[in-house]
Amino acid sequence: MEDSPQGLKRSRDPDQDQDDDSGEAGKADGSGGENQERSSDQIELDDDDFQETRPKPKRSRTHPPQQNLIEVVKGNGDLISKAVKIWVERYEDSPSLATTELLSMLFQACGAKYSIKDDLLDETDVDDVVVSLVNLARAGELEDYQSSRKKELKNFKENLVSFWNNLIIECQNGPLFDRVLFDKCMDYIIALSCTPPRVYRQTATLMGLQLVTSFISVANTLGSQRETTQRQLNAESKKRADGPRVDSLNKRLSVTHEQITTLEDMMRKIFTGLFVHRYRDIDNDIRMSCIQSLGIWILSYPSLFLQDLYLKYLGWTLNDKNAGVRKASLLALQKLYEMDENVPTLGLFTQRFSNRMIEMADDVDMSAAVCAIGLVKQLLRHQLIPDDDLGPLYDLLIDQPQEIRRAIGELVYDHLIAQKFNSSPSSLTGHDDSSSEIHIFRMLQILREFSTDPILCVYVIDDVWEYMKAMKDWKCIISMLLDQNPRTGSTTDEDSTNLIRLLFVSIRKAVGEKIIPSTDNRKQYHSKAQREIFENNRKDITVAMMKNYPQLLRKFMADKAKVSSLVEIIIFMKLELYSLKRQEQSFKAAVRLIKDAFFKHGEKEALRSCVKAITFCASESKGELQDFSRGKLKDLEDELLDKITSAIREVKDGNDEYSLLVNLKRLYELQLSKPVLVESMFDEIALTLHNFRNLDEEVICFLLLNMHMYLAWYLHSIINCEAISEASLSSLISKRDTLFEELSYFLNGIEESKKYGNQLSNRICAILAETWCLFRKSNYDSGKLERLGYCPDSVFLEKFWKLCAEMFNTSDETDEEDENKEYIEETNRDVSVIAACKLVASDVVPKDYLGPEIISHLGMHGPGVTGIIKNLITFLRKKEDDISNIYLESLKRAYHRYSSELSSGREESRVDKCLEEWRELAGGLSGMYIGAARNKYRLEILSVVKEGVEFAFRDAPKQLLFLEVAILPFATRLSVSDIIDIKKDVQGRIVHVNTDEDPSGWRPCFTFLETLEEKCLKNEDLQDDKEAANVRRRGRPRKRPETERKRLFDEQSGSDEDESISGGSDREDKLDEDAPLIETIRSAARRKALKGERSKGH
C-alpha cells in the first residue's frame, strides 16, 4: 500500500473528534495568512494564464469545451455522466489542467473557493493547501451546500456521490490506475476529513466513502473478468502449453490481478486514513454514514472486508450513544447474517458480540430495538445462540410499545411455534409440522406460562396473531375444544381455558376489534378494503361456529373461567346467516343456553357477558329469530323478578341472604343494559331496605344500586315521553325521596355507629352524587319538569362531605383478599373523590363550600387523589375567571384542621404532619403560578395575599402563622412593587403594637417581612448586575474565553502565538480590575440603607 506523503503531518490527534462548528483550526504559523492571500491571488492569475497561454482551438479540432464542474454537481444530475466524459477527454489532453479543475471542484464542494495553479500542482504541498482552507473556514468564507435549504441545492449530496461514481467508472480503463490522479484526490479528501470544520469533514467523508464503494464496483467487475480469463487460460493450456494465445491470456490475467490489487490498496488507504477516524466523529451523521458504508463494503466485497479486522467496527458501534448509528450497525449485520455463506466467517464476531445484540432488543430507541429483534432472528436461524439466552426477550411480549411486541411475536412464532430455525423433528412425530393442530398445540404450551393472568394471555395472543395462520383456523380450534381432533387428543382443563381465550381474542382481531388498549385513545379508522375483509371474516366465523356453538356452550357452561368468553362470541357473528343457512334451530338453542348460563352464574363477568349477548341477539337478529330472542329476554326478566321476590321472602323467613345477593347482582347487570321498569319491584326493594336494617353490607349496596338504576331509567323514560303526566312525575319524585331517605339513614348510621365498612360508604357517596346530578335544578328550569329539580340542603351536603373526607383517609392499597373481589374498581376511595369533584364541576351544589373543602386535601392522600383534585382545579380554572376565593378558603380549611389538632392536645407527630400538609398545600397552589402565569393572574395572586393578610390579623397574633405558611408562597410570586405595597401594609398594622409581649406569637409576622425584604433585595441585585454587565459591554468588547485549541499539524503550532494569547488574557484581566468600583459597591450600599430603615421602623 502506498503511504500518504503527508502521513506524519496528518496524524490524528484524539481531540480531533471534538467539533468546531465555527471552523477554527489549530493555530498555524505566519505563513497561513500569506497562503490565504496567495491562493486568492492565484485564482485571478489562473484565469489570466488560461486566457493568455491557451491557444484558441481551431474549428477543425474537437477539443472538449471547458466547464465548471461544481455547477454541474449543483445543477441537473442527469448531465453528470456527460460532464464526466468531457472531463476525462480533457484529462487525456491536459492532465495537470484537468486535475486542478477536479481539485477545485473538490474544494468548492466542501464550501471553499480555492484553486491550485496547474503548473504548480506537483510542487504544492497538501498540508499547506488544507491549512489555507481551514483558515478560510475560520474567516467565515465558507458555504455549506449539504445543509443548505436552497431549492437548487436539494440534490447536491446525491449529485456529488453520482459524480464520483461516474468518474471512477469512466476512468477504469485509464486514469484510475495511473497512480497519480486518484492518489492526489485521496490525499486531499483524507486530509480534509481530519480538519475541525464540520462541513469539511462531512463532505470529505461523503466523497471518501463513495470512492471505496465505487472502487468495489470496479473491483467486482475486474474480478469477474479475472475468473473468465482464468477459465479461458485453463482451457487453452490443456490444448497447448504455450503460444501467443496463452501468452495473451497470461498477460491479461496479470494486468487484471494488478489492477485489483491497486484498487484494494486504495480502499485500505481510505479506510485507514479516513474511516478509522470518522467512525467515531462527534457528528452523528458522519458516524452513521461510515457504518452504513462499511456494511455495504463487507456485503459487496467480502474477500477483503469480511474479516474481524473490519467487522469489529460494527460490533463497537452497537454501543454508540446515537440511536441512528446503532440502528445502522444492526441493519448492516442483519444483511450480513442473511447470507448463509457469510456465517462461518462470522463465528468469532458472533461469540464476541451476540450478548450485546440480544440486549439491544430492549434498546431505548424503539426502531433500534425492532432491528435488534430482527437480528436475533437471524442468529437463531443459524443456531448461533442458545435458547437459554432468550429469556429476557420473551418478557418483551408484554411490553408497552406495539412495535416491540409485534417484533417479539414474530420471533416467538418463527422460533417456538413454526420452529423454522429448528432442525430437530417435531415433538409430535408422524405429523405434518406445519399443520394448524401442531401450531396451536405449541401456542398452548406458551400460554401455560401465563395461565394465571388472562390479560397477559391476551397480550401474547395479540403479539403472535398476525403471523400465525392457525389462529384463524376456526374449525381446527373448535374440533380441539370438542375433543374431536384425533391428532391432538383431549385437552386438559388449563389448555381448554387458554384455547377458548385464544378463540375469543382471535375472533375479535379477525373482525377488527382492538383488544389491547392504546395509550393515545385515538379512534380506529379502517379502509374500505379492511372493512370488507372483516365482513368476510365475520361470515367465515359464523359458518364455522353455527352448528358447533350450542355444543361448546353445553360443554363449558358450568365453567366460570370459560363461559364469559364463550358466550360473547355470538356478538361477532353474522346472525342473518342462520336464516340463510337454515340453521334457525341452532340459533334458538344458543339463545336458550345463554339464558340458562345467566341463571347458572352469579359472577360479574359471566353475567355481563350473558346480558350483552342476549340483548345483541334481541336487537341485531331479524324476523322470527328476533322475535324469539326478545321473547327469551322477556322471559329472563320475568324469571329474575320472580327469583328476587322469592329470595326476599326467604330473607323475611330468616333464611340465608345469598340467593337475594346473587339475584340483585343479576338485576343490576341487566339494568346496566336495559330498563326494568316494574314498579312493584322498586317498592319491594325499598320495603326490604326499610324493614331489615341488619342485612349484609354487600346486599345493602346492591339494593341501593338497583333503586338508583330504576330511578335513572324512569327519569329517562319521562324525559323522552311526548305526553308527561302529573302522576308519573309524582311517582318519580316519591321514589326519589324514598331513595334519599334510605341513603340518609345509612349515612347517619355510618357516622354514628361505624358498623359498616368502606364498600357501603363509597357506594353511598357515588349514588348520592349521581342522583343529585340527575336531578340538579339547572336541568329542569321551566315547564312541567321543573318539579324534578333538586338541591341538597346544607346539613345533607355536610354529612356527604364528612363521609367523603373519611374515605379520603382510607388506604389506597388493596388487600390481597380484596384483589379478586368483584366491583373492586367501583368501591375504592377514588370513587368518593370523583363523586365530590363531579358535584362541584357540574354546579350541582354551591362550589364555595365543597370546592375549597376538596382542594384543601391536595397532596394529602397520595398521587391518585392528588391527580383527581388537580383535574378539578384545571377544570375550574378554565370555567372561572377568578378562583382566588376558592384558593383562600381551601387554605383556611387547612389552617382550621391544624388549629383543631393543636388545641385538642393530640400527639406532636400528628400536629407536625398536619402543619406540613398545610404547607405543601400552599406550595402546590402557589406553584401553579409560574412563568407568564404570574403576570396573567397577578390580580388573583394579589387578592389571595391581601385577603389572607386580613384574615391573619383578624385575631393577631393567634392567626399570624397563616401569614408565614399560607400567604408567603403566594406573596413571593408577585412583582417587587407589589411586594413593597404588601410589606408596607403589614408594617402599618404593627406600628402601634407592642410585639415584645408575645415574641413567639409575632415571629411569623417578622419572618414574613424578612422574607419579602430578601426577595426585593435579590431582585434589585440581579437588576444591578444586568446593568453593570451592560455598561461593561458597551465600554469594551467581551472577554474571549480561553479554550484548548485543536491543532491540525503539530509543527505549525508556534509558541509565539500561544504567548500572545496568554498576554491577551492578562490584559483582559487587568481591564476587569480597572472597572469602576461604583458598580461593585452599589448593591452593598443599598443593602445597608435598607437595613437602617428597618431598624428605625422597629
Swiss-Prot record:
GO terms for biological process: cell division; meiotic sister chromatid cohesion, centromeric; mitotic cell cycle; spindle attachment to meiosis I kinetochore. Residues 1-68, 1027-1077 are annotated as: Disordered. SUPFAM superfamilies: ARM repeat. Keywords: Cell cycle, Cell division, Chromosome, Chromosome partition, Coiled coil, Mitosis, Nucleus. It comes from the Eukaryota. Residues 1040-1050 have a biased composition (Basic and acidic residues). It is found in: Nucleus; Chromosome. Disruption phenotype: The null allele scc3-2 is embryo lethal. The weak allele scc3-1 exhibits mitotic and meiotic defects. Heterozygote plants are dwarf and partly sterile. Reduced chromatid alignment during interphase. InterPro entries: ARM-type_fold, Cohesin_Scc3/SA, HEAT_SCC3-SA, SCD, STAG. GO terms for cellular component: chromosome; nucleus. It holds the Pfam family HEAT_SCC3-SA. The keyword Coiled coil applies. Expressed in roots, mature leaves, buds and seedlings. Residues 275-360 form the SCD domain. Residues 245-265, 632-653, 888-908, 1009-1032 form a coiled coil. Belongs to the SCC3 family. Essential component of cohesin complex, a complex required for the cohesion of sister chromatids after DNA replication. The cohesin complex apparently forms a large proteinaceous ring within which sister chromatids can be trapped. At anaphase, the complex is cleaved and dissociates from chromatin, allowing sister chromatids to segregate. The cohesin complex may also play a role in spindle pole assembly during mitosis. Required for centromere cohesion maintenance at anaphase I and for the monopolar orientation of the kinetochores during both male and female meiosis. Also involved in mitosis. Part of the cohesin complex. Interacts with DEK3. PANTHER family: LD34181P-RELATED, STROMAL ANTIGEN. This is Sister-chromatid cohesion protein 3. The lineage of its organism: Eukaryota, Viridiplantae, Streptophyta, Embryophyta, Tracheophyta.
